[in-house]
Amino acid sequence: MATIKDVAKMAGVSTTTVSHVINKTRFVAKETEQQVLQAIKNLNYSPSAVARSLKVNTTKSIGMIVTTCETPYFAEIIHSVEELCYRQGYSLFLCNTQNNPEKIKNHLDMLAKKRVDGLLVMCAEYTQNSLNLLAAFEDLPMVVMDWGPFNENTDLIQDNSFSGGYIATKYLIDNGHKDIAIISGELKKTTAVMRYQGFEKAMQEANLAINPDWIMEGFFEPEDGYECMNKILVQDKLPTAVFCCNDVMALGAISAIGEKSLKVPDDISVIGYDNIHASRFFSPPLTTIHQSKSRLGVQAINLLFKRISEKGKEHEIIEIYPELVIRKSVKTL
């Protein structure tokens, strides 16, 4: 493999001159520059990314810590982040953690060795262990996305899940539904709690009782929606509507309803959350709460780029508000 010394020898210049041509750190005569570039081409020389980063104090790379990239919601956000990084000339190191503190630590250590310019964090839940690990990297420009806590060392994007849960439930109530079930995520996790509390507030404002037998907890997967819906369907009294706290659980719930020879929305209405790309192709097309994944990703990465270039600025909280998307899975009573 060719070295910078080989390039200098072929071009008939010093290694310092080669370095200036590569890093554009000083004026070099046009003829000399062309000789160096031709030598680089002839030798197929590739400058060391690490060595260059030490000189210009940037690696043009971003680390992204996520719970998983498999779920449609996370995948759509990651896609928007990766696309913008690519357009800005940045590499993206994507690290799946499954909320495992050991994995988080190992990934953070790896990203530190890579000398990434900044860090995006998007986890389904933030344990004290993971918060402590992130705190150790407080000097690194960092944006916490979606459900993370705010502290003075990070920027934060909030998705207002409470508002989304409220909007979804109020829409069902406004369409005449009084017997409403909820299929939630784990109620020990922030995003599930916030969406449930929004549901609870809407029910209380309408003076409607919440049936404890219709409060189901899953893990935001389609099989959870399916299993939770089946637990509801074996009860003597059925709800007229179900609020599923994400779209993939709504898909599972719709499947369970169909297997009992019932129809959505004629027999049971279903509303989801997230407005994933596939939700408009459900049968029937799913009424849901829209949380712009592309906007969330773009806001986060732009905020991080801003933090990288203006490290001394006061940290920010940016809020993104959910919106109702009406399709065909909710019946008016």
Curated annotation (Swiss-Prot):
PROSITE patterns found in the cross-reference section: HTH_LACI_1 (PS00356), HTH_LACI_2 (PS50932)
Keyword Repressor found: yes
Keywords attached to this entry: DNA-binding, Purine biosynthesis, Repressor, Transcription, Transcription regulation
Entry GO MF terms: DNA-binding transcription factor activity; transcription cis-regulatory region binding
DNA-binding region(s) in UniProt: 4-23, 48-56
Annotated pathway: Purine metabolism; purine nucleotide biosynthesis [regulation]
Positions annotated to bind hypoxanthine: Y73, K189, T191, F220, D274
Disulfide linkage: none
GO BP, one annotated term: negative regulation of DNA-templated transcription
Domain HTH lacI-type stretches: 2-56
Entry domain remark: Consists of two structural and functional domains: an N-terminal DNA-binding domain, approximately the first 60 residues, and a larger C-terminal domain, approximately 280 residues, which imparts the function of corepressor binding and oligomerization.
HAMAP family: HTH_type_PurR
Described function: Is the main repressor of the genes involved in the de novo synthesis of purine nucleotides, regulating purB, purC, purEK, purF, purHD, purL, purMN and guaBA expression. PurR is allosterically activated to bind its cognate DNA by binding the purine corepressors, hypoxanthine or guanine, thereby effecting transcription repression.
Subunit structure: Homodimer.
Name of the protein: HTH-type transcriptional repressor PurR
Originating organism: Histophilus somni (strain 2336)
Gene encoding the protein: purR
